[in-house]
Amino acid sequence: EICACLVGSEMCIRDSTYISWRWLGTESADTRYNIYRSLTEMSSYGQKINNEPLNATNFTDLFIASDDTQYFIVPVVNGEEQWDKVGAVQLWDNNYMDIPIQKPENNKVNGEEYSYTPGDASVGDLDGDGEYEIVLKWDPSNAKDAAQAGFTGECILDAYKLDGTRLWRINMGPNIRAGAHDTQFMVYDYDCDGKAEVACRTADGTIAGDGSVIGDANKNYAVVSNGKNLTGPLYLTAVSYTHLRAHETCADL
């Protein structure tokens, strides 16, 4: 199902409304779009505001919309409007969207306390509802470059819906050091089932979204002198929303 997500931010100058939406990978290259504006919530689809079907994924409506204005972005395929793939969107209150996130609790490693700050993020439709979710990496305050010695706190990945609902949390565990060179992740629909997976490197002790543990939960391979895992196995894991238990885990990398 297609919807116009991340759409409808009223411009600061308030003399127009800028609308943007996604062109999905499942849509053909010749897909066009019509935009309808409805001035009353829950009313009809209103009036079409573009003259010809658009071959872009953004549009500026020279109209000062009210809070209850709704927009409908309708795909046009072979000259036919695809109304079965349409959802209504409303204006944001600001030029950005506030999404509440849940900061992990402070923790300690080797007796030293660390805290968390949000780091890298990526987007994908994790649950197949046509709306993006956000995958966010939490970096501990003692994160280190791969060349640096020292213990780090545990790296954490969260998945959030746009209203702030947390879908899952993955704790990378003690055998994945926290740092930009150690945890990268990819969000993509690898198996083409309409729901994106999250692929990343894991190790013994990584806790998946359902609380299950990958590998041996009791193993800690961190070298006392530098905090690095130089001998323990590493895995490539894909996690899906419907299989929070680590959808697929490859053998030792």
Walk through the language-model features, giving the residues of each.
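Single conserved hydrophobic/aromatic residue that forms the stacking wall/gate
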Residues: E1-G8, I13, H243-A246, C250-L253
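Structural beta-strand segments of beta-rich domains
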Residues: T17-I19
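Surface-exposed loop/edge segments in extracytoplasmic proteins
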Residues: E41-N51, R166-L167
